[in-house]
Amino acid sequence: AEAAQLPSLLADAEYAVINSNYAINAGLNPVKDSLLIEGSASAYANILAVKEGTENTDAVKALKAALESQQVVDYINEKYDGSVVSVVTNPTDGYDASVNYDALNGTTISVAASPTPHAEILNVAKEVLAEQGIDLEVVEFSDYVQPNLVTENGEVDANYFQHTPYLDSFNEENGTHLVSVGAVHYEPFGIYGNGVTDLKDLAKGATIIIPADDSNETRALFLLQQEGLIKLPDDADAAKGVSTLDIVDDGGYN
């Protein structure tokens, strides 16, 4: 199923593997409501992405510095309480000494983003940039296609909504030329169920729905294998991707 639809489908499908971003939007608490929440998954950290060739512009570097500020890191860790986690290991004051901030004073940097948590996080970075006289315009999108297209065609300076495996897949399928300039946070996947509070009580024959896009389908299947619910081939490679067709033992689940 489409990743954004998973929370609404949960009532009919018994169980679902849901990204914490969508769980939060649906009123679920990933830490309290999930049967299991994924551990640190650095390969799936959400990134700031730009069009290739703009990585070293002052605007992009200033934006990256703001997102790596202590102010933003503290906001993420306090606001989301483990359901969204900062991956910035050395927070700064939000200032990049290599940037000509005088030249950026009075300018606007535009970023395409998902509403939650990306736009919320960017609004904190907006405060950091404002201290240097820079305005940050956050353009919200509810889908996972338009943010990359408007970044590719130059309508916005950057986007913040996806992880690297999704970006790589999107570039390959659409001929776009987008690159990551840094990881900001990750959103752990969780396994959710109706009326079940312990993973060991997950019933045989139950239906488990997972995201349909290639990168997140792979991620969900490896999580299910990690918990012993399914078995993938011994040579299964997350970097190359897997699908439900690759499952060698479904554990009695659908």
Where are these regions (language model features)?
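A bilobed periplasmic-binding-protein/Venus flytrap-type ligand-binding module shared by bacterial periplasmic
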Residues: 44-62, 188-200
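A C-terminal functional module that forms or caps the active site or interfaces directly
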Residues: 12, 16, 20-53
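Short, well-ordered beta-strand elements
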Residues: 104-116, 134-140, 207-208
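Short helix-initiation/N-cap motifs at beta->coil->alpha
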Residues: 1-6, 138-149, 236-254
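Ligand-binding "clamshell"
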Residues: 25-37, 169-181, 196
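Beta->alpha turn/N-cap motifs
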Residues: 2, 11-14, 18-24, 115-116, ...
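A conserved helix-loop-strand patch within extracytoplasmic ligand-binding domains
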Residues: 70, 181-231
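Periplasmic-binding protein-like
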Residues: 59, 67-88, 216-225
